A protein has these predicted regions:
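Short linear segments in intrinsically disordered or otherwise low-structure-confidence regions
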Residues: 11-14
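Acidic, surface-exposed loops and disordered segments
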Residues: 33-325
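Short, basic, low-complexity termini and linkers enriched in Ser/Thr/Gly/Pro
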Residues: 2-4, 30-32
Length: 325
């Protein structure tokens, strides 16, 4: 064993099975790995590492380097974040030899890279065919499906990879109906007093009421059996952008699984007029909330995508004859 004298970084040679990386006593095939004894559990397979330096170039925290033997290693750091490990796992993802593991995650357990010839048309179709869903079946989405989608949101981009977005969820339609009735009753009582959801006039409110007869079963949550509310604290990362990105990714995840989803701001305006009921959500006051996402199994299936076109006057290309001084 060789230990560093510096901070939380050390080196420990570990003999493991070449085939499945079990401890040596379980298998005769030997492979040597170097375990960096630090908070990130950064592990380099020194036999597989070819010293290409790709991990060094993609590390946003700048804490990876090649040692004199041209093997990847991690520098000491005091805490995760700006001047330490960002927990992005770019090193694990970029290594062409699969020589890097981190946080106990091994490269062989990662999802394979997508074939762009397959992914591009699938993504194009997904974006063109997703619709805001305003009518839902009175049916719960399986909890395993919801949990899987929430887990996928850990891959959504966010400022500094701080992973500050939290998710408040109603995943049972009975509970959702209960909450809907509470909010709706108060909203109607306030409207009778001339107090309407924030940002809505009497005329706009009456329009929403009229549309309940055709477009949506209820003006608040479109009859959705579930809602998801992404929110993030101010003062950390980029809460506004992070919340919007997480919400957009969740909507696409719903679309890819045959679920309908709709991004709602009207209920936020209603809840602003009833702080006691808003408090039932248990979302901290210093958190940014940009939307409430209703989702579930769609009552109406669409037959095809729309044929929207991008107006060219919405695209502004820049070109400079001389670089700015």
């Amino acid at each position: 064993t060789q230990e560093s004298q510096k901070g939380n970084v050390g080196y420990k040679k570990v003999r493991t099975c070449r085939a499945n990386r079990h401890p040596l006593q379980w298998c005769r095939k030997q492979r040597t790995e170097v375990l960096m004894m630090n908070q990130a559990k950064f592990v380099v397979d020194i036999e597989a590492c070819v010293g290409c330096g790709k991990c060094v170039k993609v590390c946003p925290g700048g804490i990876l380097r090649l040692n004199p033997s041209q093997k990847a290693e991690i520098a000491d750091f005091k805490e995760f974040g700006w001047n330490g490990c960002w927990k992005c796992e770019h090193c694990l993802a970029v290594c062409p030899m699969g020589a890097i593991s981190i946080f106990g995650h091994r490269p062989e357990n990662s999802l394979p890279m997508v074939d762009c010839t397959i992914a591009a048309p699938a993504m194009d179709s997904l974006i063109a065919n997703r619709r805001s869903c305003r009518r839902y079946k009175d049916k719960n989405v399986d909890t395993a499906v919801i949990n899987d989608m929430l887990g996928r949101l850990s891959g959504a981009p966010n400022g500094g990879n701080k992973q500050q977005v939290e998710f408040t969820l109603i995943d049972d339609r009975v509970q959702m109906d209960h909450f809907r009735q509470i909010v709706y009753s108060r909203m109607e009582a306030l409207a009778a007093q001339g107090i309407y959801p924030k940002g809505f006039s009497k005329e706009a409110y009456e329009d929403m009421k009229r549309w309940e007869k055709t477009v949506r079963p209820d003006m608040l949550f479109c009859g959705a059996p579930h809602i998801l509310i992404p929110h993030a604290p101010f003062g950390h990362g980029e809460p506004i952008q992070d919340v919007v990105i997480a919400g957009t990714h969740f909507e696409l995840l719903c679309a890819s699984r045959g679920l309908g989803a709709v991004m709602l701001t009207f209920p936020l305006g209603a809840l602003e007029q009833m702080p006691d009921i808003k408090a039932m959500l248990n979302i901290p006051a210093h958190h940014y909330i940009g939307m409430i996402i209703g989702f579930g199994y769609p009552e109406i299936q669409y037959a095809r995508g729309v044929q929207r076109e991008m107006e060219q006057d919405r695209i502004h290309r820049l070109a400079f004859e001389k670089a700015p001084i």
